[in-house]
Amino acid sequence: MTMNLITGKAGAPHITSSDQGAMQAGLVGNGNYLLQGGDGKFPAVTMQSANKALVPVLNLVIEGRYARVTAAETVTIESGVTGRNRNDLICVKYTRDSNNIETIALAVLKGTATSDTAADPTVPSGSILNNSGTVWIPIARIPISGITAGTPVMLVKQLPPMSQLWDSVTLYQDSNWIIMRNGRM
């Protein structure tokens, strides 16, 4: 059957993570997004030491898949080299096996050391929405200058809650005029 009523009762298991992910991607967007925390702030990766980055509790939507770091997790960054610069990427590594079992884990893509300006390492291509078996989603860059790891730079887009977006779509009506706000006022 090529058509399914996903939110209807079918009498047999028929809802997949792909179904839910496709719906969420349609509502939120096909990209990768960081959701606001319960404290109203967007969490950020920090450095604990020269070789340890701390990924805090956070919520992500990754190509329609909802993912959570439920307890802060430490990621190891390899030491830099004196006189060389490097960028490493902290990523969410998504895998889907031959039985369609999906898993995620934090992983580091190590950059190449250079005496010039560091560039991000190449992120292997892949898409959850296109059924790739492995997908790397960069969430933060760790700039390394010599043996010193710099301040992490968050790479994933921030997605504010819907309650903060209402004013951007609210109509204003006065007499015979209807005004729709588009952009900043």
What do these predicted ranges mean?
Residues 1-60:
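N-terminal "first-domain core" detector
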